[in-house]
Amino acid sequence: MAEITAALVKELRERTGEGMMDCKKALTKAGGDIEKAIDDMRASGAIKAAKKAGNVAAEGAIALKEDGKSAVLLEVNSQTDFLALQDDFKAFVAASVEKAFADKLTDAAPLIEAQEADRLVLVGKVGENVNIRRLVRVEGDVVGGYLHGNKIGVAVVLKGGNVELAKDIAMHVAASNPEFLLPSEVSADAIEREKAVFLSLNADKIAGKPENIVENMIKGRISKFLAEASLVEQAFVKNPEIKVGELAKKAGAEIVSFTYFKVGEGIEKPVDNFAEEVAAQLAAAKQ
């Protein structure tokens, strides 16, 4: 019998929309054969919500739980923004982040398993696909977080300073979404890509200019890029006269890390074509 790995269970869950435990049982019964497991689940009527499970859940909410020394950021997805505003969904999100924080979870997998029964009840009640997508736990000397509505969440870890400062920096991150903490973290590839973009966009301005002038123009653009992309080099949103790194230093603090979550980030949303959908339905009706 093939080994029932977590990856195999995850694949079956993604293909059927069923719970992790149900998928594990089906795979065990099928001897690790995923196609047989799917056939068995279909034959037994276990895949009742296949249509819902196939729907992309790219809306939802970000939840944050913190205590000054640690924080949990959690993303739970729904199919529509409307559901994300409903009490049943909010209650599920709140219960999930509370459990993740209390159990000191550092990964979404155990939370998904623990909340699966409640998730299925919610899906059955609201008629939409709902998924716990990702979870991050951070710990440190000083930890502060910020939620922008329920769509963006940030957790900042400091060495020194205080929670209020961490929260202020987290708010800045939510507004500015830096890619890196320090300029030194920016990869050579990222710098080369920025250089290529600059040269492409400014081909007319550069044409005919001496090489040393072009090099200075490139250096200026790269310096600006590093400042825009690095948290410590960005102008603080509440006081643009000071950089975020300087703000922390004046408070006797060092920014250790930041974590940024935005609802649906990286999820490819389907683009519905109403005309094609109607045409397909009419064609099916004629058959």
Curated annotation (Swiss-Prot):
GO molecular function per UniProt: translation elongation factor activity
Name any GO cellular component annotation.
cytoplasm
Q: Name one Pfam family in it.
A: EF_TS
Q: Which residues form a coiled coil?
A: none
Q: Specify where the region named Involved in Mg(2+) ion dislocation from EF-Tu lies, as residue ranges.
A: 80-83
Entry keyword set: Cytoplasm, Elongation factor, Protein biosynthesis
Q: Respond yes or no to whether keyword Cytoplasm is given for this record.
A: yes
Q: Which CDD domains has this protein been placed in? A: UBA_EF-Ts
Its annotated compartments are: Cytoplasm
In the record, the note on similarity to other proteins reads: Belongs to the EF-Ts family.
- Entry function: Associates with the EF-Tu.GDP complex and induces the exchange of GDP to GTP. It remains bound to the aminoacyl-tRNA.EF-Tu.GTP complex up to the GTP hydrolysis stage on the ribosome.
Q: What name does this protein carry?
A: Elongation factor Ts
Q: Which organism is the protein's source?
A: Pseudomonas fluorescens (strain SBW25)
